[in-house]
A protein has these predicted regions:
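Amphipathic, hydrophobic secondary-structure cores in small proteins
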Residues: 16-58
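C-terminal structural segments of small proteins and small subunits
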Residues: 49-76
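Generic beta-structure capping elements
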Residues: 11-13, 40, 74-76
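Short amphipathic
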Residues: 4-11
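Intrinsic-disorder/low-complexity, polar/charged segments enriched in Ser/Thr/Lys/Arg/Asp/Glu/Gln
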Residues: 5, 32-36, 68-70
Length: 76
């Protein structure tokens, strides 16, 4: 996993909560900073891809490990 500035664990939360919490966290971050999100909802894979495209942020990494999905989102 690459370097990141902030992390939050959305394990156990279902759509749309991981996206809403990521949006809130990114709002408080500076442009160029990276947020690491951990989720367990399989739907979060396509959700975070769409979210990044719609909001002008960059999805740097999307991986699955042991039933947990890890996303690195760079604030645009």
């Amino acid at each position: 996993m690459s370097n990141f500035d902030q992390e939050f664990d959305a394990s156990g939360l279902n759509c749309p909560l991981p996206i809403l919490r990521a949006k809130k966290a990114l709002t408080a971050m500076a442009s160029g900073q990276v947020l690491h999100v951990i989720a367990t909802d399989p739907g979060s894979v396509k959700d975070f891809d769409s979210f990044a495209k719609q909001t002008g942020n960059a999805l740097l990494e999307s991986t699955e490990e042991g039933g947990k999905y890890h996303f690195l989102i760079k604030k645009g």
